[in-house]
A protein has these predicted regions:
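Bacterial carbohydrate/catabolite-sensing allosteric modules
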Residues: 1-136
Length: 136
């Protein structure tokens, strides 16, 4: 659970292909629910600390983080937490499971197909799905 950690850190590289609105959504969430937070562009100069939850959007950052956790003998899901952006099959298996937050691809695909078939243009907010696993 997020409440057992002292701070949430979003790792969001400036060169990410993900929309910048993710950062503002993260900040809004943390402020709304009174979480301490920090946005970092890279893990290169960031020390991994007990009591932190890291949200990674890029797979490279997830791997760097997992390697540091292993090298520093930290207990994932107890001393430190991870939430990774976008569900993939490997995340079910890594370290007994990495928690994920993903866009609802089924709804996204269905809505996109409806728009193509009806020759419409529309803008909508697609829902997200959170899957809690051992990393949190």
């Amino acid at each position: 659970s997020l409440v057992t950690y002292q701070q949430i850190r979003l790792v969001f590289p400036t060169q990410s292909y993900y929309p910048k609105e993710i950062v503002q959504g993260f900040i809004n969430f943390c402020r709304d629910y009174a979480f301490e937070y920090k946005v970092v562009e890279s893990l290169v100069d960031v020390s991994v600390s007990v009591g932190q939850v890291y949200i990674t959007v890029m797979e490279d950052d997830l791997l760097i983080l997992l390697e540091r956790i292993r090298n520093e003998s930290l207990q994932l899901g107890k001393e430190i937490g991870i939430i990774s952006y976008n569900e993939t099959p490997i995340k079910r298996l890594l370290f007994d499971g990495i928690s994920t937050i993903s866009t609802d691809f089924e709804t996204l695909g269905r809505k996109a197909a409806e728009l193509v078939l009806s020759n419409e243009r529309a803008k909508w907010q697609n829902p997200f799905v959170f899957i809690s696993r051992a990393s949190l």
